[in-house]
């Protein structure tokens, strides 16, 4: 199972990565591969090379592009098979997130437990 994380804030990205790696260690039967990106365009380039992830954790507000736009691209490349989880400081994007068939969204700051529950 492939998980891609994209957040332009490196401290947030590192925090999510550590939580997801902890989840991967507990669920070794899933054979999780985690890839992290601070640039959403790098993430899209990787998806073009290796295919869409099973799960994408996307910050909504990033320089130059919204996470919702990235989600649209991922959904079009994965035929809607990618689970999308948005991360945002504002709940204003919740309606748009669910219109894109997001699986969930986490309001920052989120707890480790909330992210782990979402991954389950």
Residue map of PLM features:
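Non-catalytic signal-transmission and effector/linker regions of two-component phosphorelay proteins
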Residues: 1-4
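Conserved sequence signature across two-component system core domains
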Residues: 6-7, 37, 56
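Acidic di-acidic motifs
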Residues: 7-9, 89
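Two-component/phosphorelay signaling modules centered on CheY-like receiver
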Residues: 10-35
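Conserved Asp/Asn-Gly motif in the active-site loop of CheY-like receiver
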Residues: 34-42
